[in-house]
Amino acid sequence: MKVHKGDTVLVIAGKDKGAKGKVLQAYPARNRVLVEGVNRIKKHTAISANQRGAQAGGIVTQEAPIHVSNVMVVDSDGKPTRIGYRVDEETDKRVRISKRNGKDI
């Protein structure tokens, strides 16, 4: 998956289209990412859950994962870009680059 934890992304589709946020967690097996402040849902928790160390019962607002196809990584110039790879000559490792300007991400 080309989007990693810590990346700044722009939501390009869905109810939060146009929102920017930081990737809090990536789920490569499910092709989803958790973005800060995006796709917020209300989760109803039972009062009995308090015995297991959770918060008191009620309605909790939290982020839900969003599909990776609905986000684009924001490059160093602050514009959304697609991601490509190149091989670093010194370390022989893959490095992510911006397809828009060719710079490393």
UniProtKB/Swiss-Prot annotation:
**Keyword match Ribosomal protein:** yes
Q: What are the boundaries of the signal sequence? A: none
Q: Which GO terms describe its biological process?
A: translation
Q: Care to name a GO molecular-function term for this sequence?
A: structural constituent of ribosome
Q: Which domain of life is it from?
A: Bacteria
Q: Is RNA-binding set as a keyword in this record?
A: yes
Q: Which InterPro entries match?
A: KOW, Rib_uL2_dom2, Ribosomal_uL24, Ribosomal_uL24_CS, Ribosomal_uL24_KOW, Translation_prot_SH3-like_sf
Keywords per UniProt: Ribonucleoprotein, Ribosomal protein, RNA-binding, rRNA-binding
**CC terms in the record's Gene Ontology section:** ribonucleoprotein complex; ribosome
Family matches, as Pfam families: KOW (PF00467), ribosomal_L24 (PF17136)
Biological role stated in the UniProt entry = One of two assembly initiator proteins, it binds directly to the 5'-end of the 23S rRNA, where it nucleates assembly of the 50S subunit.
- Say which family it is in: Belongs to the universal ribosomal protein uL24 family.
Known HAMAP family for this protein?
Ribosomal_uL24_B
Subunit structure of this chain's protein: Part of the 50S ribosomal subunit.
PANTHER family associated with the record: MITOCHONDRIAL RIBOSOMAL PROTEIN L24 (PTHR12903)
What name appears for this protein in its UniProt entry? Large ribosomal subunit protein uL24
Gene name of this polypeptide: rplX
